[in-house]
């Protein structure tokens, strides 16, 4: 931080940069080591202020971890210096987060005047939009939800949760068979049989049609299952309201278990300290008090999520 704030074009960043101090005042008095010490104390002071304020801690950590190629310490420091107080600085950080989240919607190349925030809102609320296949943006949104809920509940998000590492994108419910089972006819027949329970409002005649096609197919069922997946996506299977981040080992331990089994394992693991769980993930699984995760649950989850994200952005 010291080097970034007081760079020396004639000296690389290494230990000797600190050896002779800095003539910050430019007075040539010979107290450069003392001046550097005072400056280090000053930097430590405001960085500690940042760390001890929950909002600043969360927003800065989110920016540095998720947009590190675009955010630098000096620019953040100048924003701090030019702010009228902590509340003003917090607002500026929210503006920075909003700018980078909405950037893809501001530069999408389409010739329309629809505001970027409105475009994001539409994608978040659209049940047929496949966020599962838009993983980079999805992860940033899900982590931002952790930040939002942590700030609201006075919970300090662990520093390793500002990035997704060793985690899978998990469907909360209604997931199709695992990748290794995509050609397993028995798994698909079992899945179609359960679709009525998910209350997806799929016409029974359509389900019967899928069932018959699978029964007739002797070996390769890729075409049939891919068509089923495409149609299910339009009902919200891959919408953002049906997706969370979950520890890879935990996710793979129950494979395609029912929602009720999955929910029980996740919450039990959390209370037994077997796995730490992200705030939004825990909220998603604990908010449903029934044994099923239906289309109605996906709709409610999607609406709540879209509202919380759009309400946060400036």
Label each residue range with its predicted role.
Residues 1-314:
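Flexible coil/loop and intrinsically disordered segments
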